[in-house]
Amino acid sequence: MSQSVSERTRIKSDRYESGVIPYAKMGYWDAAYSVKDTDILALFRITPQPGVDPVEAAAAVAGESSTATWTVVWTDLLTACERYRAKAYRVDPVPNATDVYFAFIAYECDLFEEASLSNLTASIIGNVFGFKAISALRLEDMRIPHSYLKTFQGPATGIIVERERLNKYGTPLLGATVKPKLGLSGKNYGRVVYEGLKGGLDFLKDDENINSQPFMRWRERFLNCLEGINRASAATGEVKGSYLNITAATMEEVYKRAEYAKAIGSVVVMIDLVMGYTAIQSIAYWARENDMLLHLHRAGNSTYARQKNHGINFRVICKWMRMSGVDHIHAGTVVGKLEGDPLMIKGFYDILRLTELEVNLPFGIFFEMDWASLRRCMPVASGGIHCGQMHQLIHYLGDDVVLQFGGGTIGHPDGIQAGATANRVALEAMVFSRNEGADYFNNQVGPQILRDAAKTCGPLQTALDLWKDISFNYTSTDTADFAETATANR
């Protein structure tokens, strides 16, 4: 008896039987998989729904973030499906957690368009985060292979070139955010910039939500800021700047503001993370072509980065932003008012500043990674810091960082210039003592260094007296899984 055409051509494999079969049996789980150098690796923190096997949950994440849908489709056979399927290859229980797992997943590099964060993220953090079989999902870390990294430009300027332009080495840079962030006129805004820079800061900056509101349009702000910068540079003989926020409703307007900032003499522009990945990459290309520093405010990141069980760990955002080409990114303070476990913050800073990453589980770094000659990105510490914490800031954050004292400059009782001077004197005293071998992080030694410096600097003494009891000792919501962290300010 002759067979029908459909019977003769049917694939004799359970994998391609019509209907719904488990993701693990569809090829998205392979415990024996040998990771390739060209694979993009992702580590997810998975909380399966009750009754869902963690291996099946990991396979589901692999499938739904690559080639799978909810049922078998015969068009898989028209592709190199075995190659293109993401492979979950390892599942480990999370230490000190119940029914939560780390899932390691490998993706074929050809699944992603070159130099496109939007395409990369459309798969890795796309529909899969709403998958019903998983009650919570967090992207903890990624390894981007050398071959894919080389398609991205990375920071246009980087740490070394920025220091060359400022002629400033061996010390953190000093900045401040103009306060109040909203409501000032252009003239008063420019005055804040001038006073802060003349008092000793390297930079002033716009805050995340100052764009072009009725009380001060962007062009007015830019012109008054540049007047303050030029006057302060002439008075001090130092290179100065102010981060001009060019974030706008459309890319056409962003480019318009960027071109104007360049035309009037600014050397740096600023954008917000909420602009989106395509917009960030686009203006980063412009910054490289126009020899401008690009500062990124991480506005909005805590909506998905702060909670430990769901979202995206900020270390992944750091990797993506370094790839995209920003020169600065806010990355935490440890001791300030914003979320910041010391070990986690050190991990973020390592990702931004090192050329090669080693596995460091206490810091939350799960993969080795070579940055493929992409330049280093300058971390920015901002949010609730003051000069009395200088020994802690230098200890935790090192030299390659911009320390931004907004309220800690502009809130000084004797005025903005006095606040800037207090920060400059505190920084220089602490760096000098450190270089002389002092145990500056010691709870007695560090504060004494500041008190000694304040004997010849009235503004510093005033600042220390005002903020001596201010600290933000709250337990972080995002802490290391493989080490315990002491309270940051102890």
Swiss-Prot record:
Task: Extract the GO molecular function terms from the UniProt entry.
Answer: magnesium ion binding; monooxygenase activity; ribulose-bisphosphate carboxylase activity
Catalytic activities: 2 (2R)-3-phosphoglycerate + 2 H(+) = D-ribulose 1,5-bisphosphate + CO2 + H2O; D-ribulose 1,5-bisphosphate + O2 = 2-phosphoglycolate + (2R)-3-phosphoglycerate + 2 H(+)
**What EC number(s) would the UniProt record show?**
4.1.1.39
Pfam families xref list? RuBisCO_large, RuBisCO_large_N
Locate the active site. Answer: K179, H297
Instruction: Outline the subunit composition.
Output: Heterohexadecamer of 8 large chains and 8 small chains.
Matching HAMAP family, A to Z? RuBisCO_L_type1
Please state what the protein is called: Ribulose bisphosphate carboxylase large chain
Species the sequence originates in: Detonula confervacea (Marine diatom)
